[in-house]
Design a protein with these regions (language model features):
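Active-site-adjacent beta-strand anchor residues
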Residues: 124, 145, 229-230
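A conserved active-site cap/scaffold subdomain adjacent to cofactor or substrate pockets
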Residues: 174, 193-264
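Short, conserved secondary-structure transition motifs
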Residues: 177-185, 266-270
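Internal helical hairpin/lid segments
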Residues: 238-331
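Metallocofactor- and cofactor-centric catalytic cores in central/energy metabolism, strongly enriched
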Residues: 2-139, 153, 157, 161-166, ...
Length: 376
């Protein structure tokens, strides 16, 4: 019964008639636009919804999607993957991370390759599983390779808190959490007219944690409307409609479409936990985008005893590594190209043999185009 009720709930947000009604409303309002608009979705979940339900086909020619760096696996630069690989190859280490990381290629191979060579690499759904792994392997160091935007950062913070509270001696952290607003600012700059970002569909799960307040600056300082939008197709179409209406009415505002989950302030308890254990890095390098100031997190200095980057500093590679010369993942992550613009898309680069990270992750734009490409 519970599953049926849940299905009925989802059905409301996937209702074809409602989607069609929003498509008609968008088309009607779009006739009043003074120029075409490009809307960037900053969330990989949005990209997959857009592709899965063929939403580009429902939009008029003067309303266009630009795909952003909304996938935490995709934006991880190769040198960070190399860190994971090197750590995994240590005899006394069990490397633990989230599942999408398994096939992401570094310069020496992926974690899947490391596992094939005998490394103990484990993939979990929750960081808290590290506690059990550490308890069952007291002679090994369990290193949690933490990834994700604001959405998953609180879960890592909870694990840090438990490790300290329980005095677990054999869990370390390699922190790769990144934050969304800083890279949005970076993406606005230095764009040609064709790829200009006119508005953002704000990510939903990120905003549950951080609140919509983190986007205040975009309408005020950059004249870019932001509508925080849910994952379902009805959500996406309503969010697009709200953006188009802002342009028609010559407004530039922060709005929340996803009001059933998101509010302005966000989860204050989660934010406090993040603040307690993490601080901003001066610089974090994003794949394809480059160095973005204050966009990455690290453990606070007082927790250096748990920081794998410090403890293993002497063996971790320092060189920045660029993508394969035929891979345009970086250009796609900046919203300056789409997957089908890549010459190796669907041929040399497929989910079974990924060349770039955008084809690896379940949230990657290339994976979405490969899976649902016939719909657009």
């Amino acid at each position: 019964m519970a599953e049926l009720e849940l299905k009925n709930l989802y059905d409301d947000f996937r209702d074809g008639k409602t989607i069609e009604a929003y498509a008609k409303l968008i088309a009607q309002d779009a006739k009043k636009l003074k120029k075409p608009i490009n809307i960037m979705e900053v969330c990989g979940g949005h990209t997959h919804t857009i592709m899965k339900f063929g939403l580009p086909q429902l939009l008029p020619d003067n309303v266009n999607f630009i795909h952003g760096p909304g996938c935490p696996v995709c934006i991880m630069p190769k040198e960070r993957i190399d860190h994971a690989y090197v750590l995994a190859m240590q005899e006394d280490v069990i490397l633990v991370t989230l599942g999408d990381m398994i096939k992401v290629p570094g310069s020496n191979g992926s974690l899947q390759d490391a596992r094939a060579k005998g490394a103990d690499v484990r993939f979990v759904y929750s960081p808290m599983e590290c506690l059990k792994i550490a308890s069952e392997n007291p002679t090994k160091r369990v290193i949690f390779f933490a990834i994700g935007f604001e959405t998953t950062t609180p879960m890592t913070a909870v694990l840090v808190e438990q490790v300290i509270k329980l005095k677990v001696p054999n869990i370390l952290f390699h922190i790769n959490h990144v934050t969304v607003p800083e890279v949005m600012v970076e993406l606005i700059a230095d764009r040609d007219e064709e790829h200009q970002i006119d508005a953002f569909l704000g990510p939903s799960h990120v905003s549950v944690i951080s609140g919509s307040k983190i986007y205040d600056k975009f309408p005020k300082e950059y004249q870019k409307p932001v509508v925080v939008t849910g994952f379902e197709p009805v959500d996406a179409m309503q969010g697009i409609s709200m953006i188009v209406k802002q342009f028609v009415e010559e407004r530039c505002e922060l709005e929340i479409q996803y009001k059933r989950v998101v509010n302005y302030d966000g989860n204050l308890q989660a934010q406090a936990l993040i603040e307690k254990y993490f601080e901003k890095r001066d610089i974090f390098r994003w794949r394809g985008i480059g160095d973005v100031a204050k966009s990455g997190l690290k453990l606070r200095d007082e927790f250096d005893a748990y920081n794998a980057e410090i403890i293993y500093d002497n063996i971790l590679p320092k060189e920045e590594i660029n993508d394969h010369k035929l891979c345009i993942c970086g250009t796609i992550l900046r919203g300056m190209a789409k997957p089908k613009d890549c010459t190796i898309f669907g041929t040399a680069c497929k989910p079974t043999t990924p060349v770039g990270s955008c084809m690896v992750s379940s949230e990657g734009a290339c994976a979405a185009y490969y899976k649902y490409g016939d719909l657009v």
